[in-house]
């Protein structure tokens, strides 16, 4: 759902999107301003391997086999598709664990079995489920896969240079083995050996502004509010849903998510859910801090912050020990709207400061907290349950594209861009014109967790007449309180600078929502392959059509099967994908359609294999990140391995992707992670596929509309190739031989 001079992942600590933050929400962001001129300076939303997925079909027996590393293209000799290594990012199943873990010292993958529904129903919450620790992949396996992933993306001369550097790094008794041993020791001592490194690299070290660069948005179906009261009733119902959902979290009553698709039934780590309403991203001069509001000293927050006309109000949701009813919330919201309309009482739009670069916002906050009034106001915001932003009409047509832009950046200072507080993890936007959704600060949780929460809230809103838990009304409701600010000339200067930078971000974003309606995942499943793998190959073909090359690609893969797992990266720009896209474009006439079909199968099979590798903890990105950070701490200089241009290039994710399927009418979107890149978030539905494509106007090489057109052409071409496959042959590849699994590395 989720960026960008030269402090790239290989040199600096900063990064987002998968991953993207991505994410996704997406790939780690090159630290460069979204608008190129902005000073300072992610993210997928949906996550492959998350709590659910497209059921697809049984995987090809080799789909779960760790390629040693990804093999060069060998034409398939069977007409069947590879089975679906599901991207697993839709409605999750709620179930429990059934793990068979090898004895200590063995390096095989844990046997993660499917869990029968009856057994799943009896399982405890994830905290009690005994999830395994994230394994440490074998060093030589990671190094070999890294070279294989990059060989076809760099020149032969550059590859030979990088190969020699990698061989030296991984030599027996060398630095690589020393760092690997340190990592194994870290694994023994921590719940998750990569989580701290990943959080800092993906998000907290990133100095870019949060809007577009890091924070994804979920856009609801357009609402129709004939009057202001209708808008407020919707907001009141949404707040009521938040309180009900938070009560479930507080009592640990939410069943454990379990994976669908590949290795279905495995329980998933639920820790991220408990950061939905208790997290706050505190700006820092060089690194942000993710604050969790779980103090035993401070009382549990019982208020929501409402933003209206760029003003901020405290809405207490518990008064006299009673939770406000939906009717009470509506009454209080009406008071807030009336108070906000009093222009004589309006204060400067302090929320703008949170849209600035993180170092700039940290500097401004240092000035703000010198005054006790400002400290009190900041404290109320930082400890709130969530924000609810009552937006003014955006003044544009209410297409999917324009509504998404309102969520991503608010339209800038002149519209709703200042009616936000980007540091808070969840901001629910309820616009007077029916534009509604949620803006997410991505560091505490991944896209699928946000989707699960949001779908619960929307179901609550639509069924509130039956599900609302009503408390007795409080006869005398005290008026909500306006937060006060004292702004020095220095703060006024920061506000002016923040407003100008936000306008640059708004003008620079090239964004389009495109619905492909020729077919959806139903057709793809009939081909006996994973919808996610199919779409990923289509994205590679689309990019190659426009730019005649492939680039490092990021697709979020959930590793919530393990303790405190977040995401790793599926590197979708495989050698097999390159062979296929060249056959379809460069050699269109020379390669017969039947051979193109075989190449397509190989590309999907390679994508599927890497997906399984990633969701079982065997991908390379997190492993290399941890080795790099250990080297940074141990060595006077960063090893040549992590200064090499191939490594730096491998972490500039020109194509940042994430699958975020939904079961209700909504979709997710985010910005690119590098200045010359694309963000591509997609939502596969039975008969359609919705794409949110983003890029930057300042890059003359990219165009979101052209990319969307190329995606359409690619999906149609792939459908036409599928028509060559007789219906009787449309079945999974043979599954007689026993599936093998990738080496699971060192087990705790």
From Swiss-Prot:
Outcome following mutation: residue 420 to C: In CMS6; impaired activity
Compositionally biased spans, kind Gly residues: 40-53
Active-site residues, Swiss-Prot/TrEMBL: 442
Reactions catalysed: choline + acetyl-CoA = acetylcholine + CoA
Compositionally biased region (Basic and acidic residues): 17-32
One GO MF term attached to the UniProt entry: choline O-acetyltransferase activity
Bias-annotated ranges (Low complexity): 54-65, 73-89
Biological process per Gene Ontology, one example term: neurotransmitter transport
Pfam families: Carn_acyltransf
EC category: transferase
Residue numbers spanned by region Disordered: 1-89, 727-748
Keywords recorded for this protein, A-Z: Acyltransferase, Congenital myasthenic syndrome, Disease variant, Neurotransmitter biosynthesis, Phosphoprotein, Transferase
Binding site for CoA: 520-532, 558, 659
GO cellular component, one term: nucleus
EC code(s) of this entry: 2.3.1.6
Regions of compositional bias (Basic residues) in chain numbering: 1-10
Cited PROSITE patterns: ACYLTRANSF_C_1, ACYLTRANSF_C_2
Disease affiliated with this protein: Myasthenic syndrome, congenital, 6, presynaptic: A form of congenital myasthenic syndrome, a group of disorders characterized by failure of neuromuscular transmission, including pre-synaptic, synaptic, and post-synaptic disorders that are not of autoimmune origin. Clinical features are easy fatigability and muscle weakness affecting the axial and limb muscles (with hypotonia in early-onset forms), the ocular muscles (leading to ptosis and ophthalmoplegia), and the facial and bulbar musculature (affecting sucking and swallowing, and leading to dysphonia).
Purpose of the protein: Catalyzes the reversible synthesis of acetylcholine (ACh) from acetyl CoA and choline at cholinergic synapses.
Family: Belongs to the carnitine/choline acetyltransferase family.
Annotated PANTHER family: CARNITINE O-ACYLTRANSFERASE, CHOLINE O-ACETYLTRANSFERASE
Stated name of the protein: Choline O-acetyltransferase
Species assigned in the record: Homo sapiens
Encoding gene (name): CHAT
